[in-house]
């Protein structure tokens, strides 16, 4: 088994899981089959991240724009998420995985919200890897919701405008308490962030890989961490560049 120096492993990796539909189309299969295969890749990614020593793994599961997809595809995606939680929650809990969910919950209906809450509450005391599920998530919406909360605090006299700092914003958005991602990976060869972690990813390393998400394997993940290891992270500075991992 390949090993990384724990001091050199990114604490937080976020993944835009792209390419399920194209994977299915290339094989003459319904798009829903691509999503089902993608769930298998999720299971593997969680195991591999824990094996590597990553502390936080954020997965872009369903964007706030995905509601615009065909109704049958949205329904299948909802069904897959619910099935994943029902089938895998006990195993994840047993493996000391903590689940957190980010995104707008205000308009979620049916049985999906109770399941998301159950996943969080069941694993809240776990101390292993934290898997952050970005569901009904969009970065612009996240910031708008945070700004409304802060504006309400100002209007109520509990907060002065000059107290709205970058730190205050970070503690108000959905990922409060979670470190910013060190590495953001997008599969399928597309090279854009698609409204994902725009605030948190200000200094993240970006890695765009050609593999479609269902083809994302343990070896793919290890190769991504190796590439991260070769990068220099300056965080906007000009002096004393720091390698992503020790030399």
UniProtKB/Swiss-Prot annotation:
Pfam families in the cross-refs: Prenyltransf (PF01255)
Binding site for substrate: 19-23, 31, 35, 63-65, 67, 69, 186, 192-194
PROSITE patterns assigned to the protein according to its UniProt record, in alphabetical order: UPP_SYNTHASE (PS01066)
Source taxon at top rank: Bacteria
Active-site residues, Swiss-Prot/TrEMBL: 18, 66
Cofactor(s) this protein cannot do without: Mg(2+)
Enzymatic class: transferase
Any one of the GO CC terms: cytosol
GO MF terms held by the record: ditrans,polycis-undecaprenyl-diphosphate synthase [(2E,6E)-farnesyl-diphosphate specific] activity; magnesium ion binding
UniProt xrefs under InterPro entries: UPP_synth-like (IPR001441), UPP_synth-like_CS (IPR018520), UPP_synth-like_sf (IPR036424)
Signal peptide: none
GO biological process entries: polyprenol biosynthetic process
Function (record text): Catalyzes the condensation of isopentenyl diphosphate (IPP) with allylic pyrophosphates generating different type of terpenoids.
Subunit structure: Homodimer.
This protein's name: Isoprenyl transferase
Protein species of origin: Rhizobium meliloti (strain 1021)
Gene behind the chain: uppS
């Amino acid at each position: 088994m390949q090993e990384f120096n724990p001091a050199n492993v990114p604490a937080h990796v976020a993944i835009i899981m792209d390419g399920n539909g194209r994977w299915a189309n290339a094989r003459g299969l319904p798009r829903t089959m691509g999503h089902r295969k993608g769930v298998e890749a999720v299971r593997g990614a969680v195991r591999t991240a824990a094996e590597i020593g990553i502390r936080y793994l954020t997965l872009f599961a369903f964007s706030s724009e995905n509601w615009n997809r065909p109704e049958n595809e949205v329904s299948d995606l909802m069904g897959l998420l619910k099935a994943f939680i029902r089938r895998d929650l006990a195993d994840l809990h047993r493996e000391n995985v903590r689940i957190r969910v980010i995104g707008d919950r205000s308009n979620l209906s049916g049985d999906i919200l109770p399941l998301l809450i159950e996943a969080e509450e069941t694993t809240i005391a776990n101390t292993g890897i934290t898997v952050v599920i970005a569901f009904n998530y969009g970065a612009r919406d996240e910031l708008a919701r945070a700004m409304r909360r802060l504006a309400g605090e100002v209007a109520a006299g509990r907060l002065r405008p000059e107290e709205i700092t970058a730190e205050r914003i970070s503690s108000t958005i959905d990922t409060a308490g979670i470190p910013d991602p060190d590495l953001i990976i997008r599969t399928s060869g597309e090279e854009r962030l698609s409204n994902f972690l725009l605030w948190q990813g200000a200094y993240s390393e970006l890695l765009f890989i050609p593999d479609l998400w269902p083809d994302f394997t343990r070896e793919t993940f290890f190769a991504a961490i190796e590439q991260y290891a070769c990068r220099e992270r300056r965080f906007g500075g000009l002096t004393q560049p720091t390698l992503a991992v020790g030399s």
